[in-house]
Amino acid sequence: MPEDRVDRRLAAIFAADIAGYSRLMGVDEEGTLRQLKAHRKELVNPKITEHRGRIVKTTGDGMLVEFVSVVDAVRCAVDIQRGMAERTSDLPAEKRIEFRVGINVGDIISDTNDIYGDGVNVAARLEALAEPGGIMVSRTVHDQVRDKLSFGFKDMGEQPVKNIARPIGVYQVSLIENT
């Protein structure tokens, strides 16, 4: 294989960050960090493993995760958001750690330590559109999972997103299962 060959593949990309992280750290750095580490160890990382995801990288308040299956990516996000809501329900709203999640499917460029490409950028922009505790997915994700999962989706229409040339079709995922 030539040295300059680029490793490309189709993947489901899950981007997450903590809403209000700087505020939480400003109020209680040690407590926030302790809670975050516990949430990752006891809930987030096990759910990612359970749903066959690969953590590409973490930042202080976020993470980028790659999945082979978009169904697994959405199920993982729902499990994490439900679990976080349960784990923090007894805390005042201003002390809760709440993730925002964006999921996209796209062609990515991969190297040993990171993933790149428009698919990754769109996932990050979807995450920025999500409410704290919420999940936003692209139309491509919705089209792949709508008949395979029992969660509801709300069409948020075409949304312009920063540094992406075209508007993105966006859907909000309901954490309540359809009956």
Write out the residue ranges for each language-model feature:
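Catalytic NTP-binding/metal-coordinating core of nucleotidyl cyclase/transferase enzymes
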Residues: 1-83
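Catalytic beta-strand-to-alpha-helix segment of the class III nucleotidyl cyclase homology domain
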Residues: 4, 45, 64-178
